[in-house]
Amino acid sequence: MEPNSSGSGKAAVGDGGGGGAPMLQPAPAPAPMPSANAPPPFLVKTYDMVDDPSTDKIVSWSPTNNSFVVWDPPEFAKDLLPKYFKHNNFSSFVRQLNTYGFRKVDPDRWEFANEGFLRGQKHLLKSISRRKPAHGHAQQQQQPHGHAQQQMQPPGHSASVGACVEVGKFGLEEEVERLKRDKNVLMQELVRLRQQQQSTDNQLQGMVQRLQGMELRQQQMMSFLAKAVNSPGFLAQFVQQQNESNKRIAEGSKKRRIKQDIESQDPSVTPADGQIVKYQPGINEAAKAMLRELSKLDSSPRLENFSNSPESFLIGDGSPQSNASSGRVSGVTLQEVPPTSGKPLLNTASAIAGQSLLPATSEMQSSHLGTCSEIINNQLSNIIPLVGGEDLHPGSLSASDMIMPELSQLQGILPENNTDVIGCDSFMDTIAVEGKMGLDIGSLSPGADIDWQSGLLDEIQEFPSVGDPFWEKFLQSPSSPDAAMDDDISNTSETKPQINGWDKTQNMEHLTEQMGATNIKQQKHMI
C-alpha cells in the first residue's frame, strides 16, 4: 500500500510538479530577507523612478530636493507603476509610502517627503525602516490576500479615497483642513449669493408695488373717463371753461395793446386798471411854451415904460449884429464898452446907465420902431448882471436910479475918438446940412428869432419930429452934439435929486467939464 501510495503520491507530486512548473520557476526559492545594511527594494525602486529625468513630467523631485511630487497620478499609475512595481494601483503605492513613514507635504498636490529620502543621497535609504503592523502576524497573513484582491480591482477604482485613507493620520488631517477651507469658500459664496438674492427680492418687491400703483391709477383714469363719457354736461362745461380761458388770454393781450395806444394818443384818458397817469409833455414842447410866456411878460412892461416917459430912451454903445454901419435912431442903455485895444472894462459894481432922447424921423415905420424896442429890451436885459447881481427889471430903471461912476473910471473906458462913446459907427451917421438923418431901413430888419407884437407898437408914443424946438436948439447949438448931450445930462441930473450916497451935483459938473475937455481935444485932433 505504501509503495503504491508513495508511488501514487510521487506521481501526484510529479503531476502537480509538471502542472505547476511555470508558477514555481520565477521563485524557485524564497526571497532572502533584506539585511540590515541593504535598503528595502520598494524604496530603491521609488528612488530610481523619481531620479529618472525622463519621467520628470510625471514624477520628479521638488525644488527643495527633500521630497518628490507626482504631477500626473493617472499617467503615473498607468505607465510607471506597472514598470517598477508590476501593478497600476496608485492607492497601493501611497499605502506603501505610509508604511515607510512618508508624509504628505502639500494638501493640494501629491507631494511626499521623508527625512531619509533626499536627492543625491541614496545611501540614506538604509535609515528608513518599515513600520510594524498594529494587528500582528494575523494581519501579515491577510495582507498578501488583500494585496491580491487589490490587484484584481480595476485601475482607478476608489483611488482618491484609498489614498486619503492609506496616507495615514497625517494625510487625513490635511484632507480635513483642505475640506474646511473649501467649505469656508463655499460658505462665503453662499452668503454673497444670499445677499444678492435679498437685494433682488427687494427690487422685485419695489417693481411690484410700482406696477400695482400704475394699475390703480390706470383703473382710476378709466373710471373717470367712463364717468365723463356718460355725463355730457360735464364735457360741455369742460369745453366751455377751455374756451373761456382762451378768450380771456386773447382779451388780455388785446387790452395791453389798446392801453399803450390810448396812452400815446390821449394822455388824459384814465388807464383800464384804475391808475391815474399824469401827462408829462416832452422837454421841447415845455421849453417852447416857457419861452413864449417869458417873451410876452418881458416885452410888455418895457415898451410901456419907454412910451410913458419921454426921457426913457437911453444912449449906449450896443454892439451891432452886422458889420454894416448905418444911422439908427434907437434908445438903448449905456452899458459897458467892449475892449477894442486892451482897455479895462467897466466894473460890475459900478455899471453906468444914462438916459437921454435922440431924434427920430417921420420916416420910421412901425416895423422899425419894433426893431428899436427889441434892441432896447435886449440891451436892458444884458445890463441886469452888471448891476450888483440884483434882480432888477429893465423897464423900471430911470434916471434917478442910475449910478454915475467917477471920471477916473470913465477915462479908462472912453476911447480917444468921440464917436466911439455914443456908438456913431454902430447907430449914427454924420448929420446932413438940412438937419435930417439918413436911416438904413435894411439894417433894421428883424431877426428870425424875434417875435413881434403889433399891438405893443401902437402903444408907443410918437417921437418928436424934426421941427420941434428941442431939435432946433440941438441943431443950432454951436457946440458939438456930444457937448449938448452932456449939458442935457447935467441939467437932468441937477433937477432930479439922487439918493445913492454921492454928491450928484458935484460929480455931474466934474463929469461935464471933463467930457467937454475931452471933446475939445478930439476936435483938435480931427482938425
Curated annotation (Swiss-Prot):
Residues 25-37 have a biased composition (Pro residues). Exhibits temperature-dependent phosphorylation. GO terms for molecular function: DNA-binding transcription factor activity; RNA polymerase II cis-regulatory region sequence-specific DNA binding. Its main location: nucleus. One of its GO terms (cellular component) is nucleus. DNA-binding protein that specifically binds heat shock promoter elements (HSE) and activates transcription. Homotrimer. This is Heat shock factor protein HSF8. It comes from Solanum peruvianum (Peruvian tomato). The gene is HSF8.
